[in-house]
Amino acid sequence: INSDSAFQSTLYPQYKFVKGENDVKGEKALAFARERYALGDGDNARGRHQMEIIKAVIEKMTSSTALLTNYYGIMDSLEGMISTDFASDDISSLINKQLSDGGTWDIKTFATEGEGASKKTYSMPTQRAYVCVPDESSVQQANQLIKKVMNGETISDDDLKLTQKGD
């Protein structure tokens, strides 16, 4: 995985990450995905880290026919640990296409941003809880990117740069 900063995990202090490429497995990957306190932009960085882990898993899976052909065994071992709205038939179709066509995927990510606040929530209406209040302009930008993909358009790196907050 690629880290945009060097840090030591606060939840798993035995794990340190360098800026740039890091080799992670198991608990170390979890430490990377869950960290927010050691990072300047907290929840926003944690969201980017979670996307980085997902991207790395996809890249690993698509680079190995052995992993792809053992898809059902892998999914069985993960039962109860993950959830998705992606239908199993759609996942199977993607795997079969990857096995027959090969190639690499060009994965793009975009993160909405927000600010931390203490507010009452729907789930905790009588007391304040930490929440991340989304920046509406970044949510609108994400919606536009999703619409492009849904319309069959390709997202370029320039599209992401142009839509990032502050550009």
Ranges and model annotations:
Residues 1-167:
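Residue-level signal for protein termini and structural transition zones
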